[in-house]
Structures are given as C-alpha cells and as structure tokens.
Amino acid sequence: APQDLSGKMFIFPQETSTANVXLTARSQDF
C-alpha cells in the first residue's frame, strides 16, 4: 500500500481504502 496515503486514506476500511487509493493515485498521476 502506498505510504504516501497512509495518513490520508487509512481511516477507511481496506476495501474503501483501495478504491480511494485508485482514485487518488489516478488524480496524482501516481
């Protein structure tokens, strides 16, 4: 899991976190 989002999206469950990571990663062009 991206450590960059550890403090941002780790508040959500794993499934929700995965969805958010995908969206955030896409937004950051990561």
Curated annotation (Swiss-Prot):
Query: What compartments host this protein?
Result: Secreted
Q: Which cofactor does it need?
A: Ca(2+)
Query: How is the co-factor bound, per the entry?
Result: Binds 2 calcium ions per subunit.
Q: Does the keyword Secreted apply?
A: yes
Q: What is a single cellular component term in the Gene Ontology annotation?
A: extracellular region
What GO molecular function annotations does the UniProt record carry, in alphabetical order?
Answer: carbohydrate binding; metal ion binding
Keywords for this protein? Amyloid, Calcium, Lectin, Metal-binding, Secreted
Q: Does the keyword Calcium apply?
A: yes
Indicate the segments forming the Pentraxin (PTX) domain, all copies. 1-30
> What coarse category fits the chief subcellular location reported for this protein?
secreted
According to the record's subunit comment, the protein's assembly and interactions are:
Homopentamer. Discoid arrangement of 5 covalently bound subunits.
Family listed: Belongs to the pentraxin family.
Name this polypeptide is given? Serum amyloid P-component
Source species: Anarhichas lupus (Atlantic wolffish)
